[in-house]
């Protein structure tokens, strides 16, 4: 069975919450790296009167929060009224995937 990425898990989670979601990271062929929107955003989610930017990780939520807070773009995003969340995914003792959502708007 194919392994489901944290990004795919967050896509499903957000769609269940009623968001229209798109992946906004891209593959830079020349540098051979993934580049996130604004340097930290993996997903952009829309719902009536709401825009949500999401950074997704398998772990290291605190590291991702610091990365966003240190970003020169984060204040522009906040000033635009865009909410910001970090989604951390892990397996619990039963082997079930659970999400940790940190709102850092």
State what each model feature region is.
Residues 1-105:
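Catalytic phosphate/metal-binding cores of nucleic-acid and nucleotide-processing enzymes, i.e., regions
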């Amino acid at each position: 069975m194919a392994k489901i990425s944290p990004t795919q898990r967050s896509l499903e989670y957000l769609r269940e919450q009623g968001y229209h979601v798109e992946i906004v990271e891209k593959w830079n062929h020349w540098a051979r790296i993934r580049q996130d929107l604004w340097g930290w955003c993996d997903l952009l989610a829309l719902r009536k009167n709401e825009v949500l930017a999401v950074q997704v990780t398998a772990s290291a939520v605190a590291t991702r929060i610091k990365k966003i807070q240190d970003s020169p773009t984060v204040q522009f995003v906040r000033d635009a009224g865009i909410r910001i969340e970090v989604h951390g995914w892990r397996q619990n003792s039963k082997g079930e995937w659970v999400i940790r959502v940190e709102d850092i708007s």
